[in-house]
């Protein structure tokens, strides 16, 4: 019994120490409408969808320090999307956006995209 518990602790400690804490990406809500890995027809969902109560105009907030790596618009898939390269090398994707800022600026101090 001690061995499995010890193995669990060996796994748990580095996981907790290396865990990254990100900011919540919007002021819309903290409710999810879809989660990562949900099965969809012929594919798995590749993100988290946040409930916006069918309203637009909420802020998209950068989850961590980094820079805007790519901005795209497509008629299917993500629609209006911003890719942010984070300081830890990961990429945050802000998809299904209603619009981009009118003045085209990024406010890094407030972490608002």
Predicted regions and their residues:
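Sec-dependent N-terminal signal peptides
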Residues: 4-15
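Surface-exposed, glycine-biased beta-strand/turn segments
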Residues: 18-91, 99-103, 107-111
């Amino acid at each position: 019994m001690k061995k499995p518990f010890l193995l669990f602790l060996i796994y748990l400690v580095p996981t907790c120490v290396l865990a990254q804490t990100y900011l919540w990406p919007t002021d819309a809500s903290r409710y999810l409408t879809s989660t990562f890995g949900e099965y969809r027809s012929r594919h798995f969902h590749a993100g988290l969808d946040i409930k916006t109560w069918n309203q637009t105009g909420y802020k998209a907030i950068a989850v961590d320090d980094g820079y805007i790596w790519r901005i795209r618009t497509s008629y299917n898939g993500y629609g209006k999307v911003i890719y942010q390269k984070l300081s830890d090398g990961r990429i945050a994707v802000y998809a299904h956006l209603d619009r981009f800022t009118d003045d085209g600026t990024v406010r890094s101090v407030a972490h608002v995209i």
